[in-house]
């Protein structure tokens, strides 16, 4: 249900998004989004600190997007999420960016 709230937020910010986008390396981004300027975002959804700790692939996603975010529920501790990515707190009805992701690319990435 986190994905639904995140996608509503992205749509309100002018992004079109899809879930489970297959990247060229075979991995799947939980949410990938693009806006009219061609800015590409990837949002990885984490349901718990354990889910995050088990994920070793998230750093590789930065090469596939302009900005990388994690999305968590309000029940997931914020302090376990890395500072290298933006942070979105979401529920089924909406979401809020609590930490903006830094721009990772000056030139446009390809979807790996």
Question: What label would you give each PLM region?
Answer:
Residues 46-92:
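Catalytic cores of nucleic-acid endonucleases
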Residues 10-11, 35-36, 62-64:
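Flexible, charged surface loops at secondary-structure boundaries
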Residues 1-25, 80-112:
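Non-catalytic C-terminal interaction segments of nucleic acid-processing enzymes
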Residues 21, 33-35, 46-47, 74:
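Short glycine-rich, polar/acidic loop-and-turn segments at beta strand-coil junctions
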